[in-house]
Structure formats: structure tokens, C-alpha cells
Amino acid sequence: MWRPSVLLLSSVVLACGSAETPTQAPDNPTSEADPRLSEVVQAADFAEDHPDYASYWHAGLAEISRFALTQSRYGQPREGDAIFVFVTEPFLPEAQVKHERPDQEADVAVLKLNATRTFLTGIYPYNLMTSSFAPTDGSPSLKVTATVTEWCGMAFAQLNRREGQVEAELRSYFQSEGDRDFRMDDVPFEDALWQELRRDPSALPTGETRLVPAMHALRLHHNELRPYDAQAELEEDGELSRYTIRYAELSRRLVIEFETAFPHAIVSFEETDRGETTRGVRTHSIMDAYWGHNNNDDAYLRSALGL
């Protein structure tokens, strides 16, 4: 069972403004509302029975985690939800799409992360989603897509890594960003380092490096989509480890706190962009084949995620 650091919990209490405000719900939800909740597979229990990468990630289930989100936007903290969905799937490296047809075309296994954030800014909602695709063998990530939608409009960006370069596509409602297609240097994507962390934290880039920062952060802070110089550090502190990335040019810092032991479950994340801080603290984590649970009667499963 993981434990958040004292520093992290203190920060969340201060952000919420009251020591009585709960910062984290238990990973094992009660089944009082619906007896079927007792049958939901908790990620921590699943990890005990599947202690290696192959058995954990190739069991036909997705790991779904909910984080209590405090998103800074327009200079104010906004409460919301962040959902991380990790799942393996076959991927066509040339077309860079999921391999769905029963043919003999060669594919690669990827660990996909769908990361969403939802929060309100006054009357209107924000919805962020990033999908990243990283081969399970540790070779460079292949693709990242990101969308930011709110009532003013939407923005979409996509990066494809092919033949030693990165193809970039940007579509936006906003004139200053416009519609662009361009190429950039072949560097790692911050948005796909989460999968590397889950596979082998020791393989994460450290020291001086160059990265494409998280695309949602570039969009929210109106920064150019391109590689930036970064400084990265990996620290192990007993049961918990931390991975920190700093971009001096952007005044951006990302800190990911995760369990040192496999499957290196993410405990929390904290982003600081030009003095504004966003935090997410994990509250629930389950294993589920969610794609088969799309009936109205399956909505009870949302309670297993604290939703």
C-alpha cells in the first residue's frame, strides 16, 4: 500500500484551505451502495498477483486511476478530476494507428496512456485529453495527440515520430496558433515519459536533455510547440520515488511521485508553470476492461473510481 509524502499532503491541505478537507479517498471503495463494487479488481491487489511487466500489462485489462485535481487556471485553483488510463494494444508503426483488422500486417505492442482532466472555470468547463503511445520494448515513443476544449473553442495537436524525425500538426481556433504542419528535432516527448516510468524508471532521461513539453501545458500557457532544453532528476526515497523535470525557458517544473516497487504506480503529480501550481493526488485505481462496460447499467463502476 502506498503512502503519500508528508510534504505533498501538507501542500494539498494548504491548497484546499482546511485541514479537515479530505485529500485522498481509500483505494478500496466500500460496496455499501452496490454489492457489485466488491467484485471490482483493485490495482494494488492485482499487482500482488501479477508482479512482472508481462503479466500485469498483458492480462487484457486497463489500469484506470482517478486523481483529485487542483488545476490552476486564470490565476485561481480549480477543483476537478484527472483520469489516467494505461492499457496495452497492437499498433501499426507506419500508419501509427491501432491495429484492428485481422490481417498479417506487422505491428508493435504499445503501452497507451489516455490522460484526461476536467474542471470548471466559472460558468464553463475545460476538458483536456492527451493520448500517448510508447512501445513496450522501451524504444522511442511513436505518437502523441492532445486536445484542449472549452466554450471559446478547441485546439488539437499531434506528433508522429517517423524515420528519425518528428512530424507535427497543430489545429486551433485561435489566430495566434492557427493551422500548421511542420517538422521538429527527434527528441523524447514529456507526454510519453509516464510509460517509461511504468516500464523502467532507471531508463528515464536524467541530467541535461531536450524534450517536447506536455502539449496541454504548451497550449494553456501559449508557448510554442517545439523541443526545449530541460534538466531531469530521478530520486529514490524508500517506498516512494520522484522524477522531476525543469524547463528554465518556460519556468515549468513537473514532479511525479510514484511507488518505487513494480508496477511503479503513480501516487501524485505536481506542475508549476510561471508560478501557477497544479496538483493531482491519486484516490482510486482499478483494473478493468472498460471498453466492454458501456451500458447504462455499468455506470455503478464510476463509484469504484470516486466519480
Regions found by a protein language model. Name each.
Residues 17-20:
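Bacterial signal peptide processing site
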Residues 1-6:
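Bacterial N-terminal signal peptides that target proteins for export
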Residues 159-206:
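Surface-exposed beta-loop interaction hotspot
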Residues 13-15:
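C-terminal motif of bacterial Sec signal peptides marking the signal peptidase cleavage site
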Residues 9-10:
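Hydrophobic helical h-region of N-terminal Sec-dependent signal peptides
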Residues 22-167, 202-307:
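Acidic, serine/threonine-rich low-complexity disordered tracts
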